[in-house]
Amino acid sequence: MASTQKIRIRLKSYDHRLIDASAKQIVETAKRAGAQVKGPIPLPVKKEIYTVLISPHVNKDARDQYEMRTHKRIMDIIDPTDKTVDALMKLDLAAGVDVKIELQ
């Protein structure tokens, strides 16, 4: 059985518009270079809620809640060529997107 090589790209961001634009840019670049792309697959959103007392002494009922949502996407590039890897390395993505690349 022939083993195929693939690149797994994980994207994380607090802004869903930035992560979708970056994923679209990666997919277009990989397809233009001749690779097959699976994804972007949206992963569950991690929602962290912080509750803060806004009163310095009494009035425990006076609170504010803040939330932070972390959006995640994953995509696989199947059988990447050297041209594909070079094109992905030269790609300039938004500053608010965390990119992790694994070679499998």
Curated annotation (Swiss-Prot):
Pfam families: Ribosomal_S10 (PF00338). It comes from the Bacteria. GO terms for molecular function: structural constituent of ribosome; tRNA binding. The keyword Ribonucleoprotein applies. One of its GO terms (biological process) is translation. One of its GO terms (cellular component) is ribosome. Keywords: Ribonucleoprotein, Ribosomal protein. InterPro entries: Ribosomal_uS10, Ribosomal_uS10_dom, Ribosomal_uS10_dom_sf. Involved in the binding of tRNA to the ribosomes. Belongs to the universal ribosomal protein uS10 family. Part of the 30S ribosomal subunit. NCBIfam families: PRK00596.1, rpsJ_bact. PANTHER family: 30S RIBOSOMAL PROTEIN S10 FAMILY MEMBER (PTHR11700). This is Small ribosomal subunit protein uS10. The gene is rpsJ.
